[in-house]
């Protein structure tokens, strides 16, 4: 859920390196709607999420920044029972597959990351990719009441090379921002940001995943972005 965009970015890099005011009183507005973000995330874990996506960005190869574009699919099936860090959990794997084109060359790709949630309350426990094993320092729950303009820190992941947790890679800090709806009662935009740091607390990468959530706590993907010293990536849901 939280680190998928960093995985997309790494894969793209690997592919190409290897190849107003008024004078009258305003009408009274209804109070802002309250949304249950934790319930929305729990529904997403239970029901899954999928979308066609467009890809764009830049990748630096041999000191030269090259633009790329592409398209693919984002799939996140319903979670299944699993074990994570010695405890019962739910696992949900996000996969992005498709093709990207840069400098006249088109390459196919497929990459995935698996997120883990507590079976009891749906708290986020951590995630695993091909090169990392990340564990929440404390189980992460999203707020149960948010309104447009809400924001806050969610928690911190400890990053390791593998499940032995013997080699530290640093930390990842998670936060969220809720966008103010254009119209009262309309769906609300949610941005979940992951800032990735090395063991010296140097910022390596910033990833943002954007969701839309209805008043019924149904979440859909809007897009995602990632940025590090090697380039940028923007993912836009069709």
Where are these regions (language model features)?
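Short helix-loop boundary/capping segments
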Residues: 130-202
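Short, hydrophobic/aromatic-rich segments at coil-to-beta transitions
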Residues: 46-54, 85-96, 150-155, 184-192, ...
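A short, surface-exposed beta-strand/turn
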Residues: 105-126, 181, 203-222
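N-terminal mature ectodomain segment of secretory-pathway/periplasmic proteins
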Residues: 59-118
